[in-house]
């Protein structure tokens, strides 16, 4: 992930180049940085470019979230990580929650729904997962990276809810190889981290 708004253009280029060199699957970034990273990464080949939508808390009207997603699709995003309308969820409007997401999946890009496992109670988490899948999401993400590090137990719980119907992305505080491996073993297919190049380098080092 390259989401820090204080990164300079030179630093953004460095992170892109490091990701490409280490063959990361994708780079997630903000709408502000999206065109710059698209230009740096070019077209075919190399990491995919993910746009963060409604980031970090999803506190947007549905039309603005869709507008962000539409803009991202028009400016080179390959995939979308979407923070949903948690307010609709807690107010019992699961249909509105799902319809908001369905409008975005209708754009034709793969969509991951960014949940908040650190704060959502189990019943709302289960509803959110079902609504996300019903809306056509390709995956769900454990959190937005704020708060405590993601734990293997959270990924295992999410895996139990998803039951193989969509991919799981773990995110939040993943800076050490041991945690990364634990999350993958628990059922994560993808890891969201600002330390991807460093993690990949560490995992390739021979064990002394």
Where in this protein do the model-derived segments appear?
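Conserved N-terminal beta1-alpha1 strand-loop-helix module at the mouth
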Residues: 1-75, 122, 127, 131-135
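Glycine-rich phosphate-binding active-site loops on the catalytic face of alpha/beta enzymes
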Residues: 1-2, 51-55, 74-89, 134-151, ...
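Generic structural signal for well-ordered alpha-helices
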Residues: 12, 16, 34-35, 69-70, ...
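Glycine-rich, proline-tolerant flexible connector loops at the mouths of alpha/beta enzymes
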Residues: 16, 20-36, 55, 80-98, ...
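Short, well-ordered coil/turn segments that N-cap beta-strands
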Residues: 23-25, 45-49, 76-78, 107-111, ...
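Alpha-helix-loop-beta-strand connector modules within alpha/beta enzyme cores
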Residues: 31, 35-57, 92-119, 149-176
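Catalytic cores of alpha/beta
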Residues: 60-74, 120-131, 156-164, 168-170, ...
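Conserved anion-binding
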Residues: 64, 69-73, 79-139, 143
């Amino acid at each position: 992930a390259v989401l820090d708004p204080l990164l300079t253009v030179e630093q953004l280029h460095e992170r892109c180049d490091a990701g490409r060199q280490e063959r990361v699957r994708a780079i997630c970034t903000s709408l502000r940085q999206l065109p710059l990273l698209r230009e740096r990464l070019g077209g075919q080949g190399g990491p995919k470019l993910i746009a963060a939508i409604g980031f970090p808390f999803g506190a947007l009207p549905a039309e603005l979230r869709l507008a962000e997603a539409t803009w991202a699709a028009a400016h080179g995003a390959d995939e979308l990580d979407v923070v949903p309308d948690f307010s609709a969820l807690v107010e019992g409007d699961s249909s509105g929650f799902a319809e908001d997401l369905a409008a975005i999946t209708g754009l034709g890009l793969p969509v991951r729904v960014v949940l908040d496992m650190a704060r959502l109670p189990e019943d709302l988490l289960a509803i959110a997962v079902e609504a996300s899948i019903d809306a056509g999401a390709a995956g769900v993400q454990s959190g937005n990276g704020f708060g405590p590090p993601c734990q293997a137990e959270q990924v295992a719980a999410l895996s139990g809810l998803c039951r193989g119907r969509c991919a799981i992305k773990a995110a939040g505080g993943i800076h050490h190889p041991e945690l990364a491996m634990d999350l993958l073993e628990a059922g994560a297919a993808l890891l969201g981290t600002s330390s991807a190049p460093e993690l990949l380098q560490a995992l390739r080092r021979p064990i002394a």
